[in-house]
């Protein structure tokens, strides 16, 4: 059984690799279609792997949609737990050929090769302890607060190397996600790579330091909302204000999509001295915006690591126009 699962995992990696190439070679569409068709028609259609989701919340739903809409799904079946019945039923309606809904969580585990745990943090330990796992399984925890030591304990006898923590962001549903994960795992890294950008890190300690950045999502939207509101206050209609704001933020993010250690310094330094972009950076710096960002990330990291949040005396930004 272990050999069969290993063969499936290897073929799954090959299929996902083809999909990753497909996403990057937009001008070689016909070649990639032929390549994917050849893989799909091999002895193991769609790799033969079964994915199982214990807990079908927002993140699990996004992952299922992303997986099921890949050019060639890297699995032959997806089994969903009945928890979150409305979401499970909706996914079943969208992808009836791939998805089945299990009677309970144990049925998900029994039928799946790769199991994704997507329950609420408060319930994760209880849910996992109630399940009987096997050495053949690979377990991927999507629970932000579940430590590796806890997962190793409650998912026994799954080998430690086959237990992964991953924090994806919802755009995985559209293959535009971002995922940080530990430890590196060939098949799981390839899967998340097909759903967007994946950053595998070697240790849980490093992963914890990465997690606060994912908490900037709400702030990103709030900044756009504030920009839209400013435009509306200047007399621009709501739809035009929203469309322009969204387009600008989306456009300027492209240059940082594949960043290296020097990218952001270079992008900031490219702003024309005395220009309007440089003015925004300068005034935000003078107003303490970036210091506030750093302090907030410190606080989120403390929360992730289970430490008391640093207490700081914060002064609300204010300005008065000079006469």
Language model regions located:
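Cleavable N-terminal signal peptides of Sec/SRP-targeted secreted and luminal proteins
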Residues: 30-40
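NAD(P)+-binding Rossmann beta1-loop-alpha1 motif at the extreme N-terminus of oxidoreductases
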Residues: 44-103, 107-109, 229-233, 319-322
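NAD(P)-dependent Rossmann-like dehydrogenase/reductase catalytic/cofactor-binding core
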Residues: 44-49, 161, 246, 250-323
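Rossmann-like NAD(P)(H) cofactor-binding subdomain of soluble oxidoreductases
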Residues: 63-64, 79, 85-95, 100-181, ...
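Small-residue helix-packing motif on alpha-helices
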Residues: 78, 88, 108, 124, ...
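Internal alpha-helical scaffold of NAD(P)-dependent oxidoreductase catalytic cores
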Residues: 150-162, 176-212, 216-259, 303
